[in-house]
UniProtKB/Swiss-Prot annotation:
Known partners and oligomeric status: Heterodimer of a large subunit and a small subunit.
Keyword Hydrolase: yes
Name of the protein: DNA polymerase II large subunit
Domain of life: Archaea
Reactions performed catalytically: DNA(n) + a 2'-deoxyribonucleoside 5'-triphosphate = DNA(n+1) + diphosphate; Exonucleolytic cleavage in the 3'- to 5'-direction to yield nucleoside 5'-phosphates
InterPro entries assigned: PolC_DP2, PolC_DP2_cat_dom, PolC_DP2_central_dom, PolC_DP2_N
Protein's UniProt keywords contain Hydrolase: yes
Length: 1131
């Protein structure tokens, strides 16, 4: 019986997944019981819901059922507090006071974070009961760096939970001394100057107020090698170093999320937090600006905004504060010609991913590939690039001065080398849900066909689909005049981007033209040498009107609506505007003027231009440790720098390393639970230093696998786990045979950028129709039987579409697993696949690096794009959105057979990015709440577009918009999710970002600035200055400092903070090597100065570079010893 609301078809889908999981689990369990692995059972517990995940990750035992009851009755946060209370009361076993308090805090935090992230395990080091100076006992929570993965709200709630536990244990409040209070302030300042900045910069007094009033001690482990200088050696603070975890919980938790804490405190009736109200009132506006960016829309007049009103949108410059070399700026903040804001969701957008016309992806020299991350001005901080070809594409000026609207990929490829300037970048498609999630003001919508169609529908006017999508120019004028409706968006130009006086100048030039009957165009005289004509021609470009320049003539083929917009009646061949000068004087602005002279209403084409710059390039690559290895079998330094065990065997080398081992009764040293020499069952006693019998184990492994000779096999130097238990060498040999690599936990992974998709066409995923039917895809979105590869199907929530390169890698992984089953466990092969399509239907795990819980997925196809397509729910189940982050896929059977907790590093954060528990069925209620804000409509209502002109908060129109939240606990939560904009191919556009294909940094920056130069919305001089200031200068200074403070290393692996007095390695006697080279220090010097000169950077930047140059020269150039000639002495 499933615990989720689902239709019969979805229930069957989930049952199929559960059956397949069980089959794989049983197969792996049988292999484990053979005794050849670290344990005799599969080490990944299965979880059907959040409660199971919590119990599986942090415990205590038998807590899952109670969590379900409490969450059902109370909700998540109250349930977390109640479960913490019951734990300290001993309802789940007797614990010591400190152990019970720690268990309570961990379990409560796990409930709050849905049992997915690693914070409850790794983010809380421990909980102690300590004493105040008056003898009273209080609770201290020791936070660690991985608490960051919980997010600010959960960090704050962890402190709140600690206070609740303290009260239920009858403990006193924490009473800090003045030195302890000031220590926090010193650490916060030091952290921001030496480590990194916080999202919120608190004032010293805010820190004092918080520390004095929080009833538990927020403390933690040392996380950074930076020590305080003032408030040192305090009795109750164990370290003089920065406590990064504690600072995160205090600053980005309690202080930043004060309003949210207050809401929970009031809702739950917890006392002792009233002091937060004072903090909230002092900083609420600043918090909203940082957290919500909700105060950017300002009006010059108090009346509602209309297309005639002047208005001002405050540019958000934060995204462009730092520009990385080689990664272009596509549009400066709110700059004219930038990305035009358009509302809606395509089947491959939403959940922080925005749509762009694929044509612009080619025209910016391939710097926007499918999956490339952009840092954006609004509504969020970042997005992921995906193609949507039903929105407006770019408008460009060619080298021959013609202006062309690029509305197809074919045109983009045809003209890409002839583009002189990109006048308009085209649309950015953003869904309402992203504004709701960021609590960002709903900004005015651009004038688009979907809004236009809603107006026609509301007035019960007749029209055809062809008229909406591609109308005839004469038809739209007649229709607008006849029906008294606004001019069609296709022929509505950017009149608002030039002044009304400029419009009048342009009008006079255009009306002075003549009709060319031979080619049905409107001709204008054009002399490029005439400055006045060049200026007015520029106005024509700036309104985005397509035209062709031929033989010193400008020819306009879409002349009919243009002439009527300017008050010229083409049919009557006369100017119908009277008193034009009076109209210029009496109109408020450009839009008012154009509407006064036109015979129909002309809407404002664009209200909002969105700025953006490139973030990270897309990624699709196998996960490798540094350096890449095939197995977790340690060989110390025997394999030299290349770590090849076969080389060590050939050269007869070995090494002494610390490893778990036991002396077997047969006389041999066994490193495994089953002695490879006699087959006896043994139990390694624990780690100790031994001389590793590499040769014996190598040949025994080859014999066991019946392999005569193996190729190169890379191994690790040593284990970092607690017990130092190793993986069988046979697995490393078989991985090397199949050209795959191992991760720290024994699994083999593939990383790719997260991209959402709710619907797909079989042709996009190389899908076979019959195979898709066997996987449950029987009908398309219109209810028609699946018959051809171009039908649109709704994606099931746990199905994934992997990159082509991932499919190839998984082919190798499947062959490795089959070899392992056959040659090592002596069982039948399982996958038996030889081509990509044969992997369709097999199960994988999806997992994010900051979590400790995996999600079962099913491969249904592959695409050429270097991204991992999955349902937004699937990404949300990993506590991810889709703003450019990357996560891992790995085969489920690989994880069941090869994962072990005992391989994980014994250090803080070692259990992150490991599948400590596996969710088998996706429940939308238990995923990251951000996806609940994603809209699920097939169309936006007319009221939405009208309300957008008022600049209202997104919550104010929530009642007219359907989101995923409205579907929860209904069968429709899994099916029937809509989208507003179609796209032909989800992987249309460049597949590899140019940043990855260019070579040197000089090439990258040259290409970056070439893009900036041809985009109207970008200032290349500002880009050059920002690259130098935010990237090159800090890097040059940092490397210069690192060179002077560097240690040395030896080829044997030894490292020294300072050069030994002997000048050679104390371990092996070899020559020592610098860790920072001269080249590393100088690498950006020449390119920085070249850019500064070429783009005329400010004198300040040039002088700063000169100072850095002199610093480098003083370090590497000996100015006291100079080569001279003998004749110099006779001068």
């Amino acid at each position: 019986m499933l615990h989720v609301s689902a239709s019969k078809g979805m229930t069957e889908y989930f049952k199929n997944i559960l059956d397949n999981v069980k089959n794989l689990y049983d197969l792996a369990e049988g292999c484990r019981k053979s005794g050849y692995d670290v344990t005799d059972h599969v080490e990944i517990p299965l979880a059907k819901d959040m409660a199971d995940r919590v119990e599986g990750i942090v415990g205590p035992k038998n807590v899952a059922e109670r969590i379900r009851e409490l969450v059902s009755d109370l909700g998540k946060e109250p349930a977390a507090l109640e479960i913490a209370k019951e734990i300290v009361e001993g309802k789940f076993g007797e614990f010591g006071r400190e152990v019970g308090a720690e268990q309570a805090v961990r379990t409560a935090l796990a409930v709050i974070t849905e049992g997915i992230v690693a914070a409850p395990l790794e983010g809380i080091a421990h909980v102690k009961i300590k004493k105040n100076n008056d003898g009273g006992e209080y609770l201290a929570i020791y936070f660690a760096g991985p608490i960051r993965s919980a997010g600010g709200t959960a960090q704050a709630l962890a402190v709140l939970v600690g206070d609740y536990v303290r009260k239920n244990m009858g403990l006193d409040k924490f009473k800090p001394t003045d030195d302890e209070v000031e220590r926090y302030g010193e650490e916060v300042d030091l952290y921001q100057s030496e480590v990194t900045t916080f999202q919120y910069q608190p004032k010293a007094e805010e820190i004092r107020v918080a520390v004095r009033n929080i009833s538990v001690e927020i403390t933690g482990e040392a996380t950074d090698d930076v020590e305080v200088s003032g408030h040192r050696d305090l009795p109750r603070i164990e370290t003089n170093q920065i406590r990064g975890g504690a600072l995160l919980a205090l600053v980005e938790g309690v202080l930043l999320k004060a309003p949210k804490i207050l809401r929970h405190v009031d809702k739950l009736g917890i006392e002792g937090w009233d002091w937060l109200k004072e903090l909230k009132s002092k900083k609420e506006e600043l918090v909203e600006e940082i957290e919500e960016e909700n105060d950017e829309f300002n009006y010059e007049e108090e009346e509602d905004l209309s297309q005639y009103e002047d208005y001002e949108v405050e540019a958000v410059t934060k995204f462009i504060g730092e520009v990385i070399a080689g990664r272009p700026v596509f549009s400066h903040p709110s700059k004219k010609g930038g990305f035009r804001l358009r509302y809606g969701r395509s089947r491959n957008t939403g959940f922080a991913t925005d749509g762009f016309h694929p044509a612009i992806m080619y025209l910016v020299d391939d710097f926007m590939a499918v999956g490339t991350q952009l840092k954006t001005e609004r509504p969020g901080k970042a997005t992921c690039v995906v193609p949507v070809d039903s929105i407006e594409g770019p408008i460009v000026k060619l080298n021959d001065k013609s202006v062309l609207k690029i509305d197809t990929v074919e045109k983009a490829k045809q003209y890409r080398d002839d583009v002189e300037e990109i006048l308009f970048l085209g649309d950015i498609l953003v869904n309402y849900g992203d504004f709701l999630e960021n609590n960002h003001t709903i900004l005015p919508s651009s004038w688009c066909t979907e809004w236009y169609e809603k107006i026609l529908k509301s007035e019960n006017l007749e029209y055809t689909k062809e008229f909406i999508e591609n109308p005839d120019q004469k038809e739209v004028v007649k229709y607008a005049k006849l029906t008294n409706t606004p001019l069609h968006p296709k022929y509505t130009y950017f009149w608002h981007d030039i002044s009304k006086d400029n419009i009048n100048v342009l009008r006079n030039w255009i009306i002075g033209g003549r009709y060319n009957e031979s080619n049905d165009s409107w001709g204008l005289t054009y002399d490029p040498e005439d400055p006045e004509i060049s200026i007015v021609k520029r106005y024509l470009e700036l309104i985005g009107c397509p035209h062709t320049v031929v033989d010193e003539k400008v020819e306009i083929f879409e002349y009919y609506p243009l002439l009527y917009s300017l008050g010229y009646d083409f049919d009557e061949k006369q100017d119908v505007v009277e008193d034009i000068e009076e109209k210029l004087q009496n109109t408020k602005n450009n839009m008012h003027f154009i509407n006064t002279i036109a015979p129909f209403e002309i809407r404002r084409n664009a209200y909002i231009y969105v700025g953006a710059r490139m973030g990270r390039p897309e990624k699709a690559a196998s996960r490798k440790m540094k350096p890449p290895v095939n197995g977790l079998f340690p060989i110390g330094n025997a394999g030299a720098l290349v770590r090849l065990i076969n080389k060590a065997v050939d050269e007869g080398k070995t090494d002494e390393i610390e490893i778990s081992n036991v002396k077997c009764s047969c006389g041999n040293v066994s490193l495994y639970r089953t002695c490879p020499f006699c087959g006896s069952s043994v139990e390694p006693s624990g780690p100790s230093r031994i001389k590793l019998p590499i040769k014996e184990y190598w040949y025994k492994a080859l014999e066991n696998l019946k392999i005569n000779k193996a190729g190169d096999v890379k191994c690790i130097k040593g284990m970092t786990s607690k017990d130092k238990i190793i993986e069988p060498l046979e697995k490393a040999i078989l991985r090397a045979k199949n050209d795959i690599f191992v991760f720290k936990d024994g699994t083999t992974r593939f990383d790719c950028t997260d991209v959402p998709v709710t619907h797909f066409r079989p042709v996009e995923i190389h899908g076979d129709i019959e195979k898709l039917k066997s996987l449950g895809y029987l009908k398309d979105i219109h209810g028609n039987p699946l018959e051809n590869e171009n039908q649109v199907l709704e994606l099931n929530v746990q199905d994934v579409i992997v990159p082509e390169s991932c499919m190839d890698y998984f082919l190798n992984v499947s062959k490795f697993i089959d070899d392992l089953l056959e040659k090592y466990y002596k069982k039948d092969r399982f996958y038996n696949v030889n081509k990509r399509e044969e992997l369709v239907g097999h199960l994988i795990i999806g997992m994010a690096p900051h979590t400790s819980a995996g999600m079962v997925g099913r491969i249904i196809g592959y695409s050429k794009a270097n991204v991992g397509y999955a349902h937004p729910y699937f990404h949300a189940s990993k506590r991810r959105n889709c703003d450019g982050d990357e996560d891992a896929f790995f085969l489920l059977l690989d994880a069941f057979m090869n994962f072990s907790k005992r391989f994980l590093p014994d250090k803080r954060g070692g259990q992150m990015d490991a599948p400590l528990v596996l969710t088998t069925i996706l429940d939308p209620k238990e995923v990251d709440g951000e996806v609940h804000n994603m809209d699920s409509m097939w169309e936006y209502p007319l009221e939405f577009y009208e309300k957008s002109l008022e600049g209202i908060a997104p919550k104010e129109i929530k009642k007219i918009m359907e989101t995923v939240e409205d579907r929860l606990d209904k069968e429709s939560q899994y099916e029937g999710i809509g989208y507003t904009h179609e796209t032909l191919k989800i992987d249309e556009g460049p597949l590899v970002c140019a940043y990855k294909t260019l070579g040197s940094m000089m090439e990258k920056t040259s290409a970056q600035l070439a893009v900036a130069k041809k985009i109207r919305a970008t200032d290349e001089r500002d880009v050059a200055e920002k690259v130098i200031q935010s990237h090159f200068v800090p890097d040059l200074i940092g490397n210069l400092r690192a060179f002077s403070r560097q240690g040395v290393r030896c080829k044997c692996g030894a490292k020294y903070r300072r050069m030994p007095l002997k000048g050679i390695c104390r371990k092996c006697g070899s020559r020592l090597i610098l860790t920072v080279s001269k080249g590393a220090v100088e690498k950006y010097m020449d390119v920085s100065q070249t850019m500064a000169e070429k783009y005329n950077a400010s004198d300040y930047i040039k002088q700063r570079l000169e100072i850095i140059r002199s610093g480098i020269d003083s370090l590497f150039v000996n100015d006291k010893r100079k080569q001279v000639k003998i004749e110099d002495f006779f001068k």
